[in-house]
Amino acid sequence: MSVLPDRQVINQLISGHYGDPFSILGMHETSQGLQICALLPDAREVWLVETENGRRIAQLTLEDPRGFFIAQLTRRKKSFRYQFAVTWQENPQIIEDPYRFGPLLQDIDSWLLAEGTHLRPYERLGAHLMSLDGVSGVSFAVWAPNAQRVSVVGDFNFWDGRRHPMRLRRENGIWELFLPGIEAGQLYKFEIIDCHGQVRLKADPYAFEAQMRPETASLISPLPDVVKSSAARQKANDLCSPVSIYEVHLGSWRRHTDNNFWLSYRELADQLVEYVKYMGFTHVELLPINEHPFDGSWGYQPLGLYAPTRRYGTPEDFKAFVAKFHQAGINVILDWVPGHFPSDEHGLSTFDGTALYEYADPREGYHQDWNTLIYNYGRNEVRNYLAGNAFYWMERFGIDALRIDAVASMIYRDYSRAEGQWVPNYYGGRENLEAIAFLRYTNKTIGVERPGSVTMAEESTDFPGVTLPPDIGGLGFNYKWNMGWMHDTLNYMQCDPVHRKYHHNLMTFGMLYAYTENFILPLSHDEVVHGKRSILDRMPGDAWQKFANLRAYYAFMWAHPGKKLLFMGCEFAQGREWNFETSLDWHLLDDENGWHSGVQRLVRDLNHCYRQYAPLYEWDYQPAGFEWLVVDDHENSVFAFLRRDAEGHELIAISNFTPVPRYHYRVGIPQGGHYREVLNSDSAFYCGSNLGNQGGIDSHHVRSHNHEHSLLLTLPPLATIYLLREN
């Protein structure tokens, strides 16, 4: 009897509408022997070659002029390794048949991917250079359970979706194919016939490299090698360690002066690393470097979560960039965006014709503020895609920490939505229980699998337990940005000094909740855009007062409990708002004796002072590490507090937020002795008026502020001073 494929099936296969190509193509054992089918459009002649001896076994018959070939071997019953000798125009070419290879995905991987608990989904999905049965090539795998057909397309097959349709693993909705002869650097996409019969051309969600906008293809790129962590890097992230973060947008920190073009990862590795080290920061935080189609999103609308943007170079270049920071003793934090993604056609949107990665209901799946789509955290495969990506950056690039963007938008279903525009959870509440479960799982997994690596939450509400362990009901982050402290203190500093006495509580309120979370004090990129003005420009007064206010504020911040974060340009008091399309105003530092240089020197000294004196950081999250000395002097706008470390060392910070010098100002202290002035923001070195306490002062046995000892101080105008008790 005939075993020829049905004519309708052949037509569907040739037209690219057949979803089970492996049932037809390749070598099959039948009751009449072996049957070999191949779809090779434009081929003139095809021979079957036995790989073991190179002998031509049979010529395939052109069954359909559109390129469908078939051969019957009635004398052979068992399958064997083979190749095709194909004549396209003139010279024959020996090629491997992708359809002679068996399934790629192992059962355990299939199970874990479907369950959403595969630690490294990026090792199985996407495109992977490999050798299979002695043949070099690339294995492709993509999740598209509702697609009718999925093909790999690229330059290697003329972007023709008919040539390389994939195998569907029905148990998990993953399509897979091994393509021999494909090499690193080649472009590819997935051509999907979706559930509605529409053709969609999609970039690989798991691609390790992608084209830069406006191009949208993925690139074959090797999976980066594992980067081991180190004890020093782990300790640098610890709650008891000094953490001073320099936040950077790589595309606008510095640019080529001749053409305003970006610096490459390699150029940044030389210039930025040296600068961050010189300034004394312990960490650098990068605005998102995942591939993204829109420059104006600053990276916060990524589509290629697994691909470092090619704006600045290759994945290898970025890996070298991170390694250069590590060699300098600086930890690297990456801003990470698992909350939403843009709706660009080549991306995740309606990936297989359905709302696959996003929620189907726009009341859940559409973010009206940003015109983006929200991940469906209720799907195992989506959670796995995101959690695996977090681990990928840490394991494969050595990223030391992730700062998760816009956590509030993830955990609240009614975030920025009016009544009736959101869907309650199962219990009728406003919390997104699926997103909360995802964050807990991701944070816990990182803690177990990558000890010493940490996560930081930009969470703008009072959601309880952000930095508590998931086991006791927390979200499991290590740190949380203190948005309330930032807003309160900036609002205070914007007041004219004569009015500050009426807003005294803005500077003290933060200590009422300082120990509810592990806080970072952020002056981030969000505070110098969208008409908010620069930090310097928010300060009141004439030019001298603006700079003095800023110096006093920075010194107050560096002494206050909580880790520190400062956005680039703020360290030298850039006067304009941040513009992502140009370099920072480095020319402001041309005058070494100018005010901008003075602020830069202050920030550098603050960092070195902060790292040198343990009272400023060791007990950030212990109430015993802080004590108010002067908290209620509204009239003079003076604040004084003491910082203490585990060994009992003490440092006092005193701020005078008026332009009036305070002479003979008495401050009560717990212990008497000699106090050395280790920092004064009014120093002439920082372009201040150089008023102070002549380097140090002895205490008096005079009771004040409920203490038996006190200091009689000179408080410079609009300034903060640090006094270290010497043993």
From Swiss-Prot:
Q: Which NCBIfam families match?
A: branching_enzym, PRK05402.1, PRK12313.1
Which region is the signal sequence? Answer: none
What does the subunit comment say? Monomer.
User: So where's the catalytic machinery, residue-wise?
Assistant: D405, E458
Q: What is this protein called?
A: 1,4-alpha-glucan branching enzyme GlgB
Any GO MF annotation of the entry: cation binding
EC number(s): the record gives: 2.4.1.18
